[in-house]
Amino acid sequence: LINRIVKCFTRSSPPKKIKYDIEVMNYFHFKGKRRLAQHWQRRILYKYGCDIEPGVKIHSSCIFPHPVGITLGKNVVIDENVKIHQNVTIGSSPLKSGKELMPKIEKNVTIFAGAVIAGDLTISHGAIIGANAVISRDIQAKSTVVTAKPTILT
């Protein structure tokens, strides 16, 4: 833990620092130190503009190339070698059954800027989620999801 806290204050790049901050926040969360976990959550929010809930399960190989504006819900599961770009939201859909149903992101997935992934769904391994895509159902392995073609209205 001390090693991770020290790394949070070093001169390493923001993509590395945010991972250390998340690890420290989750350490406090899973040890039952709620106030310390909330302090670290606010630190992440102020430092990077990212709203990451304590309890998110992120593999250590996950990459945040531009850690700005990312929102991750409490029980989101993110496997190894996932790349999450800026302004991505991963969380629950509106409550239907009274439980928050969170997405699971499998390994080797790339999520580009502005994507929204919501609900009880799985993004299977090797999938690519394009910029500004809105995902509300399961995505098959090695699929590419993009938004529709832009339409000029005037």
Describe each PLM feature range:
Residues 97:
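Hydrophobic beta-strand-centered segment that forms part of the acyl-chain substrate-binding groove
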Residues 1-49, 151:
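Terminal amphipathic alpha-helical/low-complexity segments used for targeting or macromolecular assembly
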Residues 48, 54, 59-60, 65-68, ...:
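Left-handed beta-helix
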